[in-house]
Each structure stands twice: as structure tokens, then as C-alpha cells.
């Protein structure tokens, strides 16, 4: 039997598209692979057809824990699933709910029960770890289908492959991502896979990257990087692979979703931090860039995650070594070590020529400055500054200052400014801190000393104000700050910190002890005019004294809502919301305390209300006792800091009050300037929706989430847990399932709570879609429209009776019945038409005589009106038969007389099933018009131009558009490499784009160019185009033309001169070559000998030699050129030296003199235009018309004289070359005035030389073959002689054939020595054999030596046998 191991379950696809869905899954068994076989899928589909599913079986819930909330009736909220009782799928249920196959519940009940218990156990562990409560009533019995549905739902939430929506349009994207992950998982890993992944992450869509992250691709990269770091000795392929992985990570972190994944997962950052210790310079550079980006991207999440990872540095090599000293020790490795240890002259030379070293230094300095700017903890910041001062970094700074680089000097100045000591407190503190351990202990003990308290409070207030400025919902920060400031002041007379903390703790504990009240927070009002502090503690129970309190009668919806909702369900949901809000608020306070007091509160430890407030009470009591003597000085400081905070709070709330022009969106009560009212009592402010430009449509709207930060979280509204507003928010969540059927039917008439400026609760009837759009589930247009309707309703209430809710809107009247004349035009569904047809009685026997015995004098319309509409109209639309209209009056045609009864004919056709047959055979296909997807806003720039710009400027992805424009105007080296791209007419000749971007161009204010505020509304590519093209459209083309001629001459001047010189030298060698002249004279004599008298000439052009390769020898098949080559090599070998004289001809034949001359003329013309533009009368002479940051004049004006001299040199070389070529062509009989004469001359000469060399190769090869043939003939003759000598002996050979044995036996008897005539015959036959073989060799037919010898021996034996036979006949 299959074991119930939870890890053994593998599910391929979810049943519904939502992530948190309950339902069955589709596989034959549990142990299936994502890549299932076709047979298994086909079987699953066949089983799915037999199994029907209800719409209510697909349960959608917001959180799994909500299924186990214990309610008053002690019943669990998991719905029962009765699959066996389902007969058919209801109407309207489509396959879009079930994208894959469906896996039925296993037949083994023990397996289901064991798995269900395992899931419950895991849920208890998860909820206990997160501090949440978990309830399950074991007395309730669930069906096996219900348990299996819950198991599969839990798996679909925790499986990384099932979290992805199974949309059919995204299957290709998923397959591509899975293929990449499989390639990364295989061993050994190939470098090309990681490099192609980096390209895909940079070029593919955001959806592709999101799927890659959801499937754990970033985890695979981190594990590969971790495996590389675990090796003791790294090889070159490992380092190259490490660089490719870091580049892929850089592409992931460049997007917001990638940054969130890396901050939520710890070990990917650990691997990146470990790369700072690499021996490869480029690896450390990439790692520093990634960490710098994380420091600035998510504050303070990024820096906190990096600081946690930096703690592992000390355990890598030396445990006693300081964390930051270990990192700073990497600065003297590889190339940087050479730069630091050499002398000044060598240092400057290395800094100028080694670009990677400069970039590495800048990256490390950027990371150091990022730490100095973003470390939130004062302890860690002081420790880091101390490490910079006492470590090796100070000596490195002194040497780095000698490097003449603008970027390095800028970062050094910033670093020195951040590290410099501003207060005497830090000097005293660092002076007496010999090491990091003592530093930590001293910091913990002296955190609340008299000298440091003022500095500490200033720093904390500065951090809080920074958070207040960056985020749009700082009410929780303000509340906690008010409470801390109030309790930290030690009131000698009337103040009591213990009472403040006790009240605060009591208010937080109210919601947990009482079921119908939420955790209330007191609003604390502090008066700083005197030394006494006044506290105003008002809970939600005290509704008469608190202006912002909510009455208990308003906690629940009234009217129709109480009639439509179930009381038990409402109580359970309210309790769940109260507990979740209490836990969220408690977690927020704990995070803030960890940020304020890191020595007392550990972020990684578990927390509870009793533990938090016991520590806080102890801390504040100790603080109060140490400051009783200095209460006057502290209170003065607190008065000053709190007043600033109070002003800031009021300014923020007033600015939020005017979100819209009419001020009706959010109303905020102004804060009293004489007291610091807690922001928890202020009205709710809806979270701001942030538009992400690089996100796809699914990720376009997202709320600001700081849940992972060590500060106050802002992921939800600070609304009351027991208000109807929170109740409606919970009901309108995307994952919340309405479990009451009565509630689902009456939801359209439920009430929604609206807040007016006077805090009057108004109950009004609003449609459900408006209420959903109010919470951000739908489009912004729906939200604005609902806001407008809401404001109108509020205005009506204020103008009328503000204390009385208007009555609910009446139900709309029923629709009026259709007229009788239109009843036949009404469209019926298929089922409805079948019902109507059953009510019509059709006679069984209708004769043809009854149909055609008809009154011919009646008109057809009268009888056609008798036919019911149910019979003459088909149940669905059929293919149309288009009639041709009559061209004569209808009365004159046969159609005017009715020859058959239409009614009986219709009944007959219906009874025979003819109409039914027509409906089945000729249905009309319904054409559904698909809704065109609205294209996302990608900017004004065309898509093809965006792709071109993104490819060309990919190296500047880390820079902002303003920084790119700065490089452009400063003529940076990287920009000069892209001059050809900026000169492309497809780039800057976009008149329509310029016209659209003209309103966003910058404006000039004296000597400063002010960027337009509207520029931020554009996309990144439009911003770049506006800054570098539209702003200088008047002189952009001439500016880039000047830079192009400068770049062209710098890169191609030497190549031009080298080509010209080679042409010149080759021409001179051709003129002075005597061997070539003698060779041409020899060919002339040979040709005149072959030609007839009229065809003989005194000279010829070189093109005539090509004719020699076309005249062939009839015997050998060779050409005349082969004969000429053999004559020269045999009889005139000294003439072959002309090949050495003309060795440069093959190379210069590829040069085009005409093209070189045209390019030089073009360069001269462009140089004249540049010189004219930069003259006193040119366009660049007016500096006011230029961009203030443009350095084109500083770059081009000093270069123009050198550029002009280079152009003059090219002109002189071209002139001299033309003169030499002209004389050379005249010498060899060519016309130099023709445009292409020189190119044709050198091409023909090159072809002659190549053909001559081929002929020489062929001739030499044939001569070697003839020599070998002659040697073979000599060897054959010698073998014949040796065979004759061997045959005259008496030796025996057992391996000889039977013929040879007979011959040898006859020879031993002496039968061959009596007759001379027989010897003569043998000799003659031998001669004939030898002549035959010689003729065979003369015909140049190759024969093997063994075959020749075998044939010779056989012939010899035959002759001798013939002699023996003759001798025997003579004896007889």
C-alpha cells in the first residue's frame, strides 16, 4: 500500500486558476511527474467526462487558517463535497474553471485520513511559529472528498509549480522557464546556459521573469553560486561561471519583483556577499554593484538584509577578525595590490591604462558610501566608522587620492564627509574604544548617558521624519513616537512613566480579552509648555468624550444587512478580524522597538505582548531614574523635537487633505497646534497606489508594502477591527468566499459605510461593483466614478439631515411585457424552443391533396399569418439563402397566387422532420468578436526604435536618464563608441516623435538648464530622447557630424594610409620588374609562332594571357598556359622570379582605388563643414544657443588643427598614388582615363598569377607521376629476369599450384632440354608478353606489382607446358 508520506505527493497542475483554491487534481496516482505521458492524460480526460463537478465545489478562501476558526456553534467551515450525487454540469459552467484534468479522490480511506492528519499537524506548526491561534474540532466528521479537496488545496499553495496561474496563453512562457531551470539543474553545468539565461532575463518580458522567480530560478542560481564557494580551489571555468551568475542576478534585481524576492530570501544575498572575498577582480566588482543597488532600492529592508549577511564574514577565515576589516582586507588583491605598492609614476600609468581597476575602486567606494548613508542602527554605523578609521582603509584612501579620476575623487570626498566626526560625543566615544567588543559593550551601557541622550533623540527623530517623508501613511509611526517621547521624559513632580506604559499595555490588551471590542489605542496629548505632562486616555468605550470615537451601535451594519447576514458567521468573522488586527499592530510595535533599541529587542526572537511591555517598562523605568537630576535640560530638548514633529504631522495631514481639487476624497480633522494628538485617532487615509512602469498588466497596481522592514509596516489601513468598514473590507477581499447562500443572494442591497468630514456615519445603498472598486479591486476609472457618487451622496446628507441616514433606494420596477406584434421576433434559447414545440399538436396523417387543394384566389399573407411563430422560425440561425428580387410587379407573377396551404405544408414538413434536418445540416456559425487587449502605455517612442535604443544603451541600464544625458554632453568615451548609432537617421529623424516630446523639453534659466517637471511622466526611453535630442534639436545633426568625423579619423586614418602606401609600392614594383617584362616577351614569341601572319602583333594587353588558359592540348588535355609554365621552368628558370616581384598583387587587388578616392573626398568635405561650423561665423560660435552642459566646443576646437593635417596628408598621398598608377597603366597598354581601369588591371593580373601557379602545380605533379611510372617499368623488367633465373633451378615450393608442380616435375626429368624449337617458341612467347606489358605501361594504366608478377609466371608456365607436350608427341 502506498505510504502516507507528505513529501511523496507530487501534483502536476491545479484545478482552478486561483492560487489558494480547493478542488480535485488530475493524475492517475499521486506519484506523478509534471511531464505526464499521453496515455495517462487521455485516460484522465475520459474519467473527467464521466465525473461532473459543481460550481460550488471550487472553494476560494483568503487564508487557510480561516477554515479552522472556532465559532460559537462549534462547527468547522469546510464545506462538504458530494461528488457522487452530481448528475450533470450546470448551465453556464465552462471549462475555464478547470484548465487541466481532475484527479479524483483515492479509494483508500486510510491514506486520505493519514494525509489529512499530516496537513493539520503542519498547519498547527505554521500558526504556532507565526504566533497565530489554530482551532480544530475533532468531533466533526468530514467526507473523504472534502478531506481530499482540502489536502490538494494545501499542496497547491505550498508547491512552487502550482502557485503559477495555469493560463493557456502562458504555457509557452512556462515551458521556456522550465527548460532553463532544468538546464541549470543538470550536472555538469555548462557556461552557455547561464550566459543565455542572462540574455533572456534582460530581453524577455516581466511575466517571464516573474515565472522564473516563482519557479525558484533565483534559488537555483544561489545554490550554484554557493556550491562554487564551497570548493577549496577554484579553476578558471568556475570563476567564469561565477561572473555569469552574478550578471544574471543583476538582471533579476533590476526589477522590483526581483528585488522583493531577494530581500525575502536570505541565502541569495549570502552568496552575493561571499563574492566580496573572491580572488577575481570582476567578481568583487559585480558583487559590490549588486549590494549597492539593494542598499538604495528598499530602505531599510535592503541594508538590514545585507547587515545580517555580513555577520557571517568573521566565520569564513579568522573568527577573531572584525567583520568589516575582513572585507576591507580584500582591497590589496590582484591588480589593486600592484597599484597600491608601486611608485607614483607607475601608479598614475596603471590608473590611466587599467579601466577595470578604476571601475572596481568606484564600485567598492559606492558600497562603502551606501553603508554610511543607509545603516539604520546607530551601533552598527559607529562600529563601521571605527573600522574605517583604525583599519587599513585609511592608508588606502591616501593612495587612492593620487589617482587622477573624477569618479574616484568624487566618491572619496563623499566618504570622507560621511566618516568625519561632527560631534564631540562621537570623538569621546571612539577615543576610548580600543576594539569592537569593547565598543559594543560600551555602547550598550552608555546608550542613555547624559551626554549622548540629546544626540540619540535627535537621530531617532531624524529617522522617524525620514520615514514620514518617504511613506504616505505614517500614523503608526507618529503614535509610537508620541508614546515613547511622553514616557521618556522624567517628570519629577506629577509624571509617572509606569502608569503611562501600563495604560498603553492595557489598551492593547483590551481587544484580546473582550470579544466584541477591538484593541484600542489611547490618544495621548502631551503639553510641553511646563514641566508637567498631561495625559488624555480615551478608549473606544468612552464615546461621549472622544470626538473620533465610534459608537457600539455603529460597529455592525444595520437595516437590511442584519436581515441578510447570518449572526454566527458575522461573529466569527469579526473575531477573526479583531485577532488579526491585534497581532498586526503588536508586530508593528515590536519592529519599531527593535529599530530603536537593538540591544534590548532581538528581531529574530519570538515576541508576545507580555514580553514586549515588560521589557519596555523596565527600560523606561531605568531611563527615568537616570534622568531625574537633568529633567529641565531634557524637557527643553523634548519640547523642541516634539514641536517639530507636531508641525510635521499637521503639515502632512493638511497636504493629504487636498488630494483632489474639491477636497472631497479624504477629510482630515486639522491637528490642534497646542497639543500633539495621536495620529491613530485621525481618519483613515487610503493607501496610495503606485504605478510600476516596468511591470506587466497584472502587477501595474500594487500597494506599498513594508512588511519586511524593521520599522512600522504600512501594508494595511489603520482601521478599527470591529467597524463595518473593516467588515466590508474583509468581505470584499479577492480570496474571501461568501459561505451563506442567503447572504450571496442579498449582497447587492448590503450597506456600505461612508465617512463625512464631521465623522458622521452614513449608510447608503451602493452597487456591489462600486463597493469593490472602492477597495482597489477594479480599474481606476471605476474608483473615480464611485468616489464622485459617494461625494454626491454625502453632500445630500449634509444639506438635509446630517444625523439621519437616508432610506434605502426602492427596487426597480419589473420590465413591461413585450407587445403582441413583437412576440414572433423574440429570440428563444434552444431549450425554450423545444418546450414551445411540444405544446403544438401536429396531425399524424396529412395528405398531399389537402395541401394543394387550396383556394387560389386568396393571397399568401393571409394564410401565412395562421402559422405559429414557433414553427416558421428555427431554433437557431441557419445559413441564409439570398433571393434575387423580382424585376416586375409582384401582382403579375405566379407568386401572387397561392397554390398550397402554407399552414398544412408547414405542419407536414415539421412532422416529417425536414425542418429538424435543415437545422442540423445548415447551422450558421456564430462569430464571436474577441475583445482586443488594450495596449499598455509604453511611451511615445515606436517599439522598433525602443528596441534599438535598449540594445545600444544596455551598458547604461544602471544610470538614470539625466546621468546618461550628462555623459552625452560631456562626450564621454562610452558615448564616442556609439557615434554611429547617434548619427543614424532612423534615430534622430523622428519628426513626429519630436513634436510629441516638445512640451517636455527642458527650459533654460540663464546658465542653467532646468529639467521640466513633466519629464518624469514619460517612460525611460522618452526621457533619454528628450534630453539628448529634443533639447538640442537645433544643432544636434551638426554636433554629431563633427563627432563622427573625429571618431572616424581616429579609428580609420592609419588604415587609409596603409592601403594607399601598399597600392603605391605595388605600382612601383610592377614598373621596375625586368623578369616580368622578359616573361611577357617570351609569351609574345610563342603566340606569334602559333598565330597566322595577319594575327601576329608587336604587343598585347595583360588580359590576353587569360586566353592561354583556354587553349587545350588534344592529347593530354592540358592548356597552353601549362606548356608555357613548363617551358619557363625548364629552359628559363630565372624568369620565375617575377612571382616574387609581384607578391603584393593578390592583396592590393582587393583594394578599390575609386572608392578610396571617393572616401577621401568625402572626408575633406566634412572636415571643411566642421571647420566652418566652429569658426567665428559658425553655429557653435554662439554659446548662448548651446546647451549649458555641452562640452562640444572644448572637445572639437583643440582637435580641428590635427584633423585638418590628417586630411591634408590623405590628399597628398592620393594625388601621388594617382600619378604613379597612371604611368603604370600607360606602360602596360591600359587606358588610365577609364573610371575602372586600375581595378580591372589589378584583378586581371591577380588572376594570371593564380592560374600560372595552378599550372605549375599540375605540371610538377604529372612529372612526378611519369618518373614513378618509369621506375615501375624498370622494376618490372628486373623481376622478369629474376623469375627466369628462379624457374631454371630445382627448388621445390609446396605452395605452388598444381600446374607449377607438374612443370617442376617435368623439368627435373630433363624433358625441356632436347628440342631447340620448343625453346625458341618459349622465347618468342616471352617476348610477346614483355611487349604487351610495355604497351600497357605506355598507355599510363596503373597495374599492381603483384598482379604483373603473377601474370608473368603464369604465361611462362603455359609456354613451358606447351614445350613439354610437344616433346612427348615427338618421342611417341
Curated annotation (Swiss-Prot):
Family per record: Belongs to the formin homology family. BNI1 subfamily.
User: Which InterPro entries does the annotation name?
Assistant: Actin_filament_regulator, ARM-like, ARM-type_fold, FH2_Formin, FH2_Formin_sf, GBD/FH3_dom, GTPase-bd
Show where the GBD/FH3 domain sits.
104-522
Q: Which PANTHER family match?
A: PROTEIN BNI1
Could you identify this protein by its name?
A: Cell fusion protein fus1
* Motif SH3-binding boundaries: 802-817
Q: Is Cytoplasm set as a keyword in this record? A: yes
User: Subcellular localization, per the record?
Assistant: Cytoplasm
* Taxonomic placement: Eukaryota, Fungi, Dikarya, Ascomycota, Taphrinomycotina
For this record, the Gene Ontology CC terms, alphabetical, are: cell division site; cytoplasm; cytosol; mating projection; mating projection actin fusion focus; mating projection tip; mitotic actomyosin contractile ring
Keyword Cytoplasm appears in the UniProt entry:
yes
Identify the residues that the record assigns to the FH2 domain, covering every copy: 868-1278
Instruction: Note the Gene3D superfamilies from the entry.
Output: 6.10.30.50, Formin, FH2 domain (1.20.58.2220), Leucine-rich Repeat Variant (1.25.10.10)
What turns on expression?
A: By nitrogen starvation and by a pheromone signal in both P and M cell types. Essentially unexpressed in vegetative cells.
The record's annotation in Pfam families points to: Drf_GBD, FH2
Record note on quaternary structure? Interacts with actin at the FH2 domain.
Molecular function (GO) terms for this protein are:
actin filament binding; SH3 domain binding; small GTPase binding
Sorted UniProt keywords: Cytoplasm, SH3-binding, Stress response
UniProt GO BP: cytogamy; mating projection actin fusion focus assembly
Which superkingdom is the protein from?
Eukaryota
What the protein does? Required for cell fusion. It associates with the pre-zygotic projection tips in conjugating cells.
